[in-house]
Amino acid sequence: MKRIFLFILTNIAVVAVLGIVASLLGVNRFLTANGLNLSALLGFALIMGFGGAIISLLISKPVAKWSAGVRIINDAQNADEAWIVETVRKLADKAQIGMPEVGIFEGAPNAFATGAFKNSSLVAVSTGLLQGMTREEIEAVIGHEIAHVANGDMVTMTLIQGVMNTFVVFLSRVIGYAVDSFLRRGSDNNSGPGIGYYVSTIVLDIVLGFAAAIVVAWFSRHREFRADAGSAQLLGRKQPMMNALARLGGMQPGELPKAVEAMGITGGIGKWFATHPPIEERIAALQNAPA
C-alpha cells in the first residue's frame, strides 16, 4: 500500500505544481484566446497528465526512502540483515531482474517495492515485519514485492495514472470554460478566462482527481492478486504467502480479520480508495489458483 499511496500522492503534488506554473505562464489565457482550442488543450492535458505521472515514477525511490525513513543495507550488520539481502538476491535471480536495493524501515508490519526500472528498484521491509513473521513468511512477502517489480507494476500504474491525469486536466478545463462562458454571457470582456473558469477548474481538478484515484486504486487491487500469485510461483508453493497474508490480517488461515469483517458489513467509501483487496479475498484467490 505504501508504494501506490506514495506514488498517487506524489503524482497529485507534481500535477498541482505543473498546473500552477502553467497558469503563471499564461497557458490558460492562450488556450482560450479565441474560444477553447481543443487540440491545444488535448496536447496540454497529455503533457500535464503523463508528465506528472512520469516525474512521480522517476522520483519514486528517493521519495519512498525519505518518507518511510528507509535505511539501505550496504553492509549487513547482523545475520538477519544478511539473510534479507540474500533472500532478495535469490528471488530477484529467479524473477530475472537486477538486484534491487534492500532497505529496512521502522514501523508496523509492512513492505514495499518501488523504482522506475526493473533492474534498479528498491525493496524495503519494516522492523515490525521482521519481528512478527517467520522467515518463510518474510520470504513470501519479499517474493510478493519482487513480483511487483518483475511484472512492471510501477510502469503500468504510471501509464494508468497518466491517462487519468489527462482526463482530469482536459475535462476540468472544458467544463470550466463552459461555466465561465455562461457566467459572462452578454459581456464585452473577452480578454481571457474569468474567475468562473479558474474556480471551476480548481474544483473540478479536485473532484475528478478523486474519481481518478478510485480508478487507479481499482487497477492496483487487481495487480495485488497477480503479485500474490507471483510470490507463490517464485517460492514454488502457495502456503507461505497465504500464511503471511493471514498473519498480516491478524488471523489464522480461514478466519476473517476483525477490521475486514467490519468493513465488509458496513461498506463505505474507504473500500473504493483501497489499493489492496481484503485479505480473505487474496487468500481465497491463492487457494483457488492452480498449483
From Swiss-Prot:
Q: How does it sit in the membrane?
A: Multi-pass membrane protein
Residues at the catalytic site? 145
Q: Which residues cross the membrane?
A: 4-24, 39-59, 159-179, 199-219
Q: Which residues bind Zn(2+)?
A: 144, 148, 224
The subcellular localization recorded is: Cell inner membrane
Cofactors (names): Zn(2+)
Q: Can you list the GO cellular component terms from the UniProt entry? A: plasma membrane
Question: What broad class of enzyme is this?
Answer: hydrolase
Q: Does the keyword tRNA-binding apply?
A: no
Which is one GO molecular function term here?
metalloendopeptidase activity
Please indicate if the UniProt record lists tRNA-binding as a keyword: no
- EC identifiers of the protein: 3.4.24.-
Cofactor binding mode and count: Binds 1 zinc ion per subunit.
Which InterPro entries has this protein been placed in? HtpX_protease, Pept_M48_protease_HtpX, Peptidase_M48
Chief subcellular location equals membrane
Q: What Gene3D superfamilies does the record point to?
A: Metalloproteases ('zincins'), catalytic domain
**Which UniProt keywords are present, listed alphabetically?**
Cell inner membrane, Cell membrane, Hydrolase, Membrane, Metal-binding, Metalloprotease, Protease, Transmembrane, Transmembrane helix, Zinc
* Superkingdom, natural source: Bacteria
Stated name of the protein? Protease HtpX homolog
Q: What is the lineage of its organism?
A: Bacteria, Pseudomonadati, Pseudomonadota, Betaproteobacteria, Burkholderiales
